Amino acid sequence: MARDEVRRILPADIKREVLIKDEKAETNPKWGFPPEKRPMEMHMQFGIINLDKPPGPTSHEVVAWVKKLFNLNKAGHGGTLDPKVSGVLPVALERATRVVQALLPAGKEYVALMHLHGEVPEDKIYAVMKEFEGEIIQRPPLRSAVKRRLRTRKVYYIEILEIDGKDVLFRVGVEAGTYIRSLIHHIGLALGVGAHMAELRRTRSGPFKEDETLVTLHDLVDYYHFWKEDGIEEYFRKAIQPMEKAVEHLPKVWIRDSAVAAVTHGADLAVPGIVKVHKGIKKGDLVAVMTLKDELVALGKATMTSGEMLQKSKGIAVDVDKVFMPRDWYPKLW
């Protein structure tokens, strides 16, 4: 049986075209703090760590260790991993804590080891697992923290990496909230022999991947001490990503300097403040409101399409939900 090449694409990989509303708009370099220019303390306050969670502790325990290590008031993680599961766990710090909400629509990727309870021909394994791509129906496991209602989830791709007897190693890209243990159970039923999950590792959470930004808890301890005790901030700075990393995949609306303070003071985003937008924004979409220096101002729900934002001269374009930028980064100009 020919093995088709798998296109590993998550929602976070979608490329978007930028549409410009005001070509003459500029930003004042005196205002704001672009991600690459933030002082170390500020970088940590508005940062997110691409943490390699070890098997053993719960996700909450890992976050608690990070808080204690850095003496933080707040921290949060994007997508709980069971204690035995390892891999990518984005941990947002202090003022960036609520940005993990932005990772929900981004998609996740795992590498799983499935153990079959009987012998199955390889061709059948490939054929049956291919059928699980697309919309599937799941009920959360008994031990899940959410109500056990039936719900649909999307499987973006399944790629078999290796088959060794009854063991099947595969990579899977899924919508947030998909239970891989349940997926494997149902694959086993479809194969007619039963199956269980032997091992699981998360390899992606939206824009956070197994790349040079992934750090272990041991790395963090070392890098933090290099900074605090030796004054060497280079390694610790690289270990913390700016919160803007967590919204890379979202459709964006860029606003002029004069509109920033109004949004940080609680106003929804009105059309006159818009300079450019991503193509394809639909009403109800979660969007990131950005400055012209690519600083994250807020997250909100689009109340207009991209086309309407470009064509209209007034009205509310984004219903702002969560504000991340401090009020004093840009001056009041109203």
From Swiss-Prot:
In Pfam terms, one family for this protein is DKCLD
Q: Which UniProt keywords apply?
A: Isomerase, tRNA processing
A molecular function GO annotation: tRNA pseudouridine(55) synthase activity
EC annotation? 5.4.99.25
EC top class, in one word?
isomerase
Could you list the residue ranges that cross the membrane? Answer: none
Domain PUA residue range list: 250-325
Q: Which GO terms describe its biological process?
A: box H/ACA sno(s)RNA 3'-end processing; mRNA pseudouridine synthesis; rRNA pseudouridine synthesis; snRNA pseudouridine synthesis; tRNA pseudouridine synthesis
Which reactions appear under catalytic activity for this entry?
A: uridine(55) in tRNA = pseudouridine(55) in tRNA
Source taxon at top rank:
Archaea
Can you tell me which residues form the catalytic site? 82 (nucleophile)
The record's listing under InterPro entries reads: Dyskerin-like, PsdUridine_synth_cat_dom_sf, PsdUridine_synth_N, PUA, PUA-like_sf, PUA_sf, tRNA_PsdUridine_synth_B_fam, TruB_arch
User: Which family is this protein grouped under?
Assistant: Belongs to the pseudouridine synthase TruB family. Type 2 subfamily.
Q: Which HAMAP family match?
A: TruB_arch
Q: Which NCBIfam families does the entry link to?
A: CBF5, PRK04270.1, unchar_dom_2
What job does this protein perform? Answer: Could be responsible for synthesis of pseudouridine from uracil-55 in the psi GC loop of transfer RNAs.
- Protein name, please? Probable tRNA pseudouridine synthase B
